Structure formats: C-alpha cells, structure tokens
Amino acid sequence: GKVVDKKAEYIDVRKYPKTVKVVEEMARFYNDSPTLRRILASADTPFEAREVLGCMMCDAFMEVTGAEIGIVNPGGVRIESHPQGDITVRDVLEMDPFDNHAVVLELTGNEIVHMMLTYCHNTLHSFPYVGGITCEITLEEDFPEKIKCIKLLTLDGKKLNMKKKYKVVTNNYIPATSEIPEGSDHILNLETSDIIMQFLEKKKVVSYQGVSRQKIRPLE
C-alpha cells in the first residue's frame, strides 16, 4: 500500500497517567536488587560534570587494558553528575548502560586527532573526553562551536609525538562512527561497564573534582 499521511507526537512518560502493575513490580524488584546496590567504591569528592565522569572512565579503560591513551565519547556518559559518597553497581550501569565493548587501537598521534575530529565532526559539543593526554582546542573565530585545530599534549605539558604509535582504548562506538586506518582496531571480550567496576573496586576511593583535560585556546 501507499502511505498517504502520518502523525507523531511526544509523550511525557513521567506524566502519563496509566500504569501497569506487573511492570511496576518488575521495576521495583530490579531496582531493589542487592546486586545493583552493591558498593564498589567511594567518591571522596562529587563528580560535578559529565566530563569529570568521562575522565574517570578513560582512566579505568587505560588501567584495566594497559593502554597509554583512553577516549570516551560524551554520549557514552549517560549521567551528568554523581554526589560524594558510595558508587554502586547501579550507578555504573546508569553511567554506561549500552553493553559496549572495549576496543584497543594502534594509532599515531595524527591518526588519533583524525579519529576524534571525524567522530565529533569538528564540533566542540561532541568532542571526546580523554585520559593519558590533554587536548588544547582552538575554535573558529566566526563559529565558536567549530574546532579549528587541536594539539595533543602529554600529562606534563609536552607536545605529543604525532608520528609515534600509541596503544589507545575506547568503546566500540567511536571506531564505528569515525575514520580509522583499516585493521587498526581490536575488540576485546570486555564490556566497558565491567571495566569501570573493576577499576572502582580496586581503587576503593576516587576523587576527580575539578579534573578537565580539555583547554580552549584563544585565537591568536
């Protein structure tokens, strides 16, 4: 047949009057599960921004896989903040709910830049969070959300060797939505949420208050 008309509307499920008791009970049972309430670590200070959580995730990816550089897309961090105090299994699954797998890549500095810029389409809003390095970002003068160029630096502020190859770890979403050299990626049999849990259980206490690995440079 032929579609002659169509209509769609948004429904605010939080205000939707109808409920299904069976579904409500299933959700309550799931949310009250001791498995989800298990404490992994304690946040010594609050995580006050999505980037701060992303930096912690990058560090977790690096520590568990032995990679030199960690990268996480902003959309891969699904909560905006987390208070000081306990971090539970449920918190991690809310932070990273996608069943993503870790991917290790062997990339030069230039290839890392190309991967990140093709992923975010040169926009600051979607620029990934990082671990093991910092990023100096210069924006276009006429389009302040558009990235003109980025410089990768080591954690002690030295310029990264852009021709050297580095072991990079990310989730499977970034390589699937960016440009990378053929055959440079290797998917691990490790879910990223499990990696974060391993990291937190090992650390016991974490503090990332004020951590940022992106610096916006003024136009010269």
Enumerate the language-model features and the residues they cover:
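Catalytic centers of hydrolytic enzymes
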Residues: 1-220
